[in-house]
Amino acid sequence: MGEINNNKEINEKDDEINNKRLKYEGFIKKEKKKKQKIDHSIPLKEKPTQEDIDSHSECLFWIVNKKKHRAEFCKYKRAKDSILCNHHKPIDQISSEPQPQLTDYNGDDVTENNNNSTTTTTATTQDDNSKPKERKRIHCPLNPTHIIYECKLQKHLKACPNAKVGQKNAHIELSKKEPYYKENINDLNENVKLTLEPIILSQVSTENLINISIKLDQFFEKFFKNEIQSLNQTHKSFDKIFNSDQQLKHIQQESSIINLLENSNLYNSDNVYLEFGAGSGKLSNHIFMSHEKKSGHILIDRMKFRSLKKVDRLIKNEKGCHHFSRLLIDIRHLNLSNLSILEEKPFVITSKHLCGCATDFTLDSIFNLLNNSNEKVNNNFKGIGIATCCHHICNFNTYSNQSYLKDQLNITPLEFQLICSISSWATIDENKCNNDDDDNEVEEDDELIKKDKKEKKEFENQLKIEFNKQDVFSIKRKEELGYKAKRLIDYGRYLFIKEKLNLPNTKFWIYTNQSKENLFLVSNK
């Protein structure tokens, strides 16, 4: 027994020593990675000395980088019969050179034999005399400092940093050529259009704020006599699919949405799920996984996400996926009638946190689809499940139910704009009203998306912070009014779904307690 205890003590000491060593090594690595301070007082070498030239065996092109305060030789290998690499050789000297030929270890051409064909994988095209063709090198048309093979021009242009600015919006232009594109088809064209600016709450008088707060209380009591039902339960597939704490909050919200879809008979592996405002498509992936990878999906978003390839591949490359497509298009211009798959498969409209007027465009797109399609499409349409958010960026011109504002609320367009602004108060936090709200999180993997989110957040914070300077309401009262404003905006959408889309079985649900953006509109036929 004594020997066993001694061995345990030795092992524990060894583990402790190893842990300390690993921590120390990690610390050293971090210290090495830290940027060294640049001493700009030391003059840069404009030209190399003969000693520098003699000691350098690679390309002898001298690079002076004033930004990094560094001067050094290029580190690429020299080209054949030259003191420079192919990148730095004059273009007239490298305009043509033989294309390399791939060989195996026996010196033979590398080929792949398939059942139906033989494909040569050599990097050269040979003529009758078995002489490799020459590849021409040219300047990049976007940046003359880039020298590339002419045969690889198109590939280079896709990755060229100078092309990225134009590429950010290229998909928007390309979408105009698609059969499902129709200019402003979902722009609620029957609406009254007025010239209205967003209302800044700091510019609203105390009297107007008090008057609109009284109306909000009255309307909320009228339309929401009973509390909105809450179903904050994860789906049965949750524990089987996810076993980590990474982004647990969002995963739980998605699981709760799936649970509500199932309870509303909108959950079936035969369905094609159209996710509006899909972002990187995590809700669709969660639905797909919960169906044991046996469902169809159409992801719709006007943004182009770098990370979309990750989630998209998780769905479309599976054998059980009976349909997949991603539509890079603004919902305002999406003509669902030209999606042929909707005639072939039952489909459900879904979304998690569909921002502002995008919800209204989505409802209008469904209205246009059901009124302009054949009986097959109408029969295949099973229902809607939409989680709304960002009511503060809604506006009168694009609101889906203007008749509700006029006939039931009896408010003016300006009063509606004020209600939209007040809805931003729902997400005020007493301790950190300036901090970003993770509940409306989108994948920030593209500069365009970062800019779009930043502008939206600046506008939201302006509405939150720049309230009337007399501080008419307490923080708690503001949150209450903001919540009521959101629900009244959603109530008009609820009536639109029931009356215009002819879906009387429409319900409100509170689907999460982890976010103040927590309302889910669900309806089935």
Swiss-Prot record:
In this chain, composition skew of type Polar residues spans 93-104
Q: Where does Zn(2+) bind?
A: C140, H146, H156, C160
BP GO terms, sorted: tRNA methylation
Basic and acidic residues bias: start-end ranges? 38-50
Which residues constitute the signal peptide according to the record?
Answer: none
Q: Does the keyword tRNA processing apply?
A: yes
For this UniProt record, the keywords arranged alphabetically read as follows: Coiled coil, Metal-binding, Methyltransferase, S-adenosyl-L-methionine, Transferase, tRNA processing, Zinc, Zinc-finger
For this UniProt entry, the molecular function terms from Gene Ontology, in alphabetical order, are: tRNA 2'-O-methyltransferase activity; tRNA methyltransferase activity; zinc ion binding
In this chain, the CHHC U11-48K-type zinc fingers fall at 137-164
> What EC numbers are recorded for this enzyme?
2.1.1.225
Give the reaction(s) catalysed: cytidine(4) in tRNA(Pro) + S-adenosyl-L-methionine = 2'-O-methylcytidine(4) in tRNA(Pro) + S-adenosyl-L-homocysteine + H(+); cytidine(4) in tRNA(Gly)(GCC) + S-adenosyl-L-methionine = 2'-O-methylcytidine(4) in tRNA(Gly)(GCC) + S-adenosyl-L-homocysteine + H(+); adenosine(4) in tRNA(His) + S-adenosyl-L-methionine = 2'-O-methyladenosine(4) in tRNA(His) + S-adenosyl-L-homocysteine + H(+)
Q: What is this protein called?
A: tRNA:m(4)X modification enzyme TRM13 homolog
- Organism expressing this protein natively: Dictyostelium discoideum (Social amoeba)
Q: What is the lineage of its organism?
A: Eukaryota, Amoebozoa, Evosea, Eumycetozoa, Dictyostelia
